[in-house]
């Protein structure tokens, strides 16, 4: 137990640096806050809405045009009744104004910043400066293209979105344990390979030399 505690303490400083690095790799802004569940209400709402959309279109197989028209009709009737009741002063709450319904420029700016960030990252990967990252991107895209043959586009997007919303949070919560387990597995694998080399690989040239002398 003492060894485990010492090795866990040894990884804490590097773990905090990796956590900050992962947060900044995701943009370090609102998108990263959502992925790391900094605002649990907002992250939970987005996940719930995306899950509802996936359930309606993939499980229930609800027609998209029908769904869109019914949502618009629902909003029209809600605002119509709300405006009528608000004007007759039956309730104190007034319907939202047109300015309340407009999408703010900051939201559009956030969206376009994320698109620009993605384009810049894609360009950096394609330049070949980091061959390891380039290889990882090519393999990941190839795996996604193969997996896409077995899932619909919406299901695949849902799986990717759920992964993006859960993996960073779980990694941040159990990072020390995962880092310790990964480093310990790496050391054990290295010892096993060294043992295999010393007992099997290193004996092959000796066996070849003996056969040559006997010949």
From Swiss-Prot:
GO terms under biological process: response to bacterium
Localization per Swiss-Prot or TrEMBL: Endoplasmic reticulum membrane
GO cellular component: endoplasmic reticulum membrane
Record keywords: Endoplasmic reticulum, Membrane, Transmembrane, Transmembrane helix
Transmembrane segments: 41-61, 62-82, 141-161
Keyword Calcium: no
Topology versus the membrane: Multi-pass membrane protein
Location (main, coarse): endoplasmic reticulum
Annotated ranges, domain Reticulon: 31-211
Entries under Pfam families matching the protein: Reticulon
Name assigned to this protein: Reticulon-like protein B14
């Amino acid at each position: 137990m003492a060894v485990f505690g010492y090795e866990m303490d040894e990884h804490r400083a590097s773990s905090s640096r990796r956590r900050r690095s992962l947060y900044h790799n995701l943009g370090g802004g609102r998108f990263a806050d959502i992925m790391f569940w900094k605002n649990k209400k907002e992250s939970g709402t987005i996940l719930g809405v995306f899950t509802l959309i996936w359930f309606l279109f993939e499980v229930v197989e609800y027609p998209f045009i029908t769904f869109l028209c019914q949502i618009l009709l629902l909003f029209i009737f809600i605002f119509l009744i709300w405006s009528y009741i608000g004007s007759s002063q039956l309730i104190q709450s007034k319907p939202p104004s047109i300015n309340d319904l407009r999408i703010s420029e900051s939201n559009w700016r956030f969206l376009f910043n994320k698109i620009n960030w993605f384009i810049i990252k894609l360009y950096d990967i394609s330049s070949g400066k980091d061959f390891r990252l380039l290889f990882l991107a090519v393999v990941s895209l190839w795996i996604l293209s193969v997996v896409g043959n077995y899932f619909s586009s919406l299901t695949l997007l849902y799986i990717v979105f759920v992964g993006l919303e859960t993996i960073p949070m779980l990694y941040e919560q159990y990072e020390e344990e995962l880092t310790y387990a990964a480093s310990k597995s790496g050391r054990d694998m290295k010892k096993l390979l060294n043992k295999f080399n010393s007992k099997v690989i290193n004996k092959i040239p000796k066996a070849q030399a003996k056969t040559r002398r006997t010949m």
